Amino acid sequence: MKRIYNFILLVCLVQLAVAQNRIAEIRENLLGNYSDRVLVVSHRADWRNAPENSLQGIRNCIDMGVDMVEIDLKKTKDGHLVVMHDKTINRTMTGKGNAEDYTLAELKAMRLKNGAGCKTRHQIPTLEEVMLLCKGKIMVNIDKGYDYFQEAYAVLEKTGTIDHCVIKAGLPYERVKAENGDVLDKVIFMPIVNLHKEGAEKIINDYQSHMKPAAYELVFKDDNEEMLRLIRKVRDSGAKLFINSLWPELCGGHDDDRAVELHQPDESWGWILNQGAKLIQTHRPALLLEYLRKKKLHD
């Protein structure tokens, strides 16, 4: 009996060490300076094979070897943070209205829909449930969730996952600092910069002067010389580039569907890699991982 107990304890310790190493490895690739590895970020989890932003979709991403899963937050009537992208629950759940119109128990009584709009057995997850599932396995990118920055931070603190999370916002440094300065340096914060908007370069300069973020999410509908100049500016600053391949208007036309439907991965993901991107957010995580592995840019 003692041998069995010791064996079980050893297995648990090994699993814990592997989990800790997994997150440490992803963080090193995100925050360090010397890795060739490119991180794969799956947008709204594995929504092609499970309901978007669902625990099952996140499990699928973990099993694939995805590095980071993107989620969005809303708050329930009774103050719980849940994972939901849209303003309403109409498209993705069996109910109607806004998440804040319902208590968590009421939302849990509903079911998530799949990509075809059919009811599934899956429930809307809370942020706490997501972080506990992801703990030691995959990092989390909170995209539409800045309005709940402080509350999200409290959940990360409670679950021991502050080091697992990236929080983003498309806002200038001064506002982010004024609203969340007390916790800003305790998390990985990533600015989102639309390179076409007036003042984009000033936003970059201000962040570089005051914060020096580990990475920037850059959005650009064209790949003209001015966009490429700003991309180089961020890359040459030492920050990592986070580029979306979700649809053409986010990446100058070098999107997932170009890679998959037009069979032009080198003109899509390859082009993004050539700009120096170290994080690619995708709707095709399995295929992007396959592409990167062939280039020895991912395990």
Predicted regions and their residues:
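Bacterial Sec-dependent N-terminal signal peptides
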Residues: 1-23
